[in-house]
Amino acid sequence: MSKSSGKPGPDEDRLELLERSELLGYLAAGLAEAADGRGCMVLLGGEAGAGKTALLREFCGNDLSARVLWGACERLFTPRALGPFLDIAQPAGVELGRFAPNRRVPHEFAGALVAELANDFPTVLVVEDVHWADEGTLDVIKLLGRRIESLPVLAIVSFRDDQLTADGALRIVLGELAGTRAAVRRHLPPLSLEAVRMLAEPAGVDASRLFERTGGNPFFVTEALAAVDAD
């Protein structure tokens, strides 16, 4: 995936990427496996502001020698049916519209998507914010997760794990995928006090107090330090 020609401002996104090298390395290893035809699905959880999107942008912004397909769910009162896959379908070469009259849309589309992904070129497939997903999207994710092991695909599915409910559809899907060999659940933790200190001290901010106020949440840390800079 080619990088954007626009350049971020000073330290943009970087504040959220401290202590993320291990997970970036894990994703790189997963893509290497996928390139050899052994696909996997990474179920990436973390609270709001943990830096999931920043991490995925950093990973996909590298020269991966892979096709990148990116879709996202949106916070709507009526979620878009197969929302993230509407984003993915055209660049993936799948004509989603032809499945619309069929009630088995998720099953039909999942089959078409798997067929398209079963080629010799590796693919990184990102589906963001599935805590807002409709049931059809979750069905496609589940069906893909069951078949991904034989595909040259690294699928990364992100969600807010602090918004899971005991009887929610997403928790059920995550539980079912946990029983497959190719799906792995990973958690993106808050920053440690040491990481917050690395960011706070150059700005003359008390690190312990900032850590206590933000809980190490990268977004809150970033916003607090930006407010100091604005003053």
Where are the predicted features?
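Key residue(s) within conserved catalytic/signature motifs
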Residues: M1-D231
